[in-house]
Amino acid sequence: MAKGESKRVPEHPHWYEDLPERDAPLDRAPKMVHGDVNAMDAICLEISRASTLMRGLGIAFGLVSVAGLIFFVVMICLVLFPLEPDLIVPLAISPLLAAMGVWIAFLLLKTDLSIPRDRPVRLNRTQRKVYVYEHAYGMNPFKKWPTTVKVFDWDTLQAELHRQAGFNGKAYIQRFSLWLVSCKPGTNEVVDRFELKGNHPTRAELYDAWAYCRTYMEHGPEGLPVYPPRRQEVTFRRSFFEYLRFLDPTEEGREERAQMTASEWILNSIVALLAFWLLFPMGIGHYIAMRFAPEVKWPPEIDAESRRGPSHRAEAASAIGG
C-alpha cells in the first residue's frame, strides 16, 4: 500500500513512497546490489543501470511477431484464390493488420537492439553533480532515438520509490524502482526525474542503494562496502543465465547463491518454476541484444568533467554555465 501522498508535485502515477532526505540520519547499513558498481574512487561513483532493463524480451517477442506476420501473409495468399464474397472485408483490412504487425515487430526489436549496453549514472562528490547517461526511446521505431547526458545538482535531488503490479495469468507480480527527483531549490516542485535502479521484486535493496549513494556523497568511499567492478563481458553463458543467475553452474552462479538469503531462495525458486519457459528464451534474446547494442560512449568533455576533482570545480561550473 502506498504511504499517503508524495510531498513532491506533480506526483508520479506509479509513486509508492518518499525516501529519507539526503542529509537524514541513516536507518540501515548502506550497500549496493551486487554487481551494480562500475567504478568508485574518492571523486566519482559510477552506478550501472544494466539490470534495470529486461533485455531480450523485445528480441523474443519481436521474433514471434515476425513469425506471426509471415504466417499471416502466407494465409492471406492461400485464401486469395478463389476469392469468396465473405472474404472481401477481411482481405480489405489485411494491409492494416500487416502494417501493425510490422510496426510492433520493429518496435520490439529496435528497443532491445538500439539501447546501449548500459546507461550508467556518475555521482561526483567533489563537484556535487550527478551525470545521467540516458537513451531516449518512443513508439516510432523508424525514428532515431538519441543518447543524451543530463546533469543534476546533488543538492536538488531527493529519492522516491515507484511500484508497478499486475497479474500475468499465473501469478501476481510487482516490481519496485528507485527514482531520483530534481526539484526547484527550496521547493517540492519537480523539474525532472530519472530512474536509478529498477525491476526489483522487493524494496530492501533499493533502500540500501539510496543509503549507499547518500553516504558516498557526504563521506566518500571510506567505510562503505567495496565491490569489484561489474562484469561487462558479453558471453552466451552469462546471457543465458541472466535472469536465473543462481542456476549458473560456474563460479559466478556460486557467488550469487552464497549471497542469497532464505527468502531469496524461496522467491527465486518460485520464479524459476513458473517462468523458466520465458526467462531462458529471454536469456538467448539478451545475448543477441547485447551483441548488437552500442557500447557506452560518454561525450569527451562530459567524461572528463564527471571525473574531475575539486581543483577543477570553477572550470567545470564555467563550462556548464556557458
Question: How should each PLM-predicted stretch be described?
Answer:
Residues 1-37:
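Short, non-transmembrane cytosolic segments of multipass membrane proteins
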Residues 38-53, 176-178:
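Short, hydrophobic/proline-enriched secondary-structure or compact coil segments at domain edges
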Residues 40, 213, 220-262:
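Juxtamembrane amphipathic/hinge helix adjacent to a transmembrane helix
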Residues 46-118, 245-322:
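Alpha-helical transmembrane spans
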Residues 122-137:
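Membrane-cytosol interface motif
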Residues 129-130, 140-166:
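Phosphoinositide-dependent membrane-docking surfaces
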Residues 163-176:
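Short acidic, Gly/Pro-enriched loop/turn segments at secondary-structure junctions
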Residues 177-216, 222-233:
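Canonical phosphoinositide-binding patch of PH/PH-like domains
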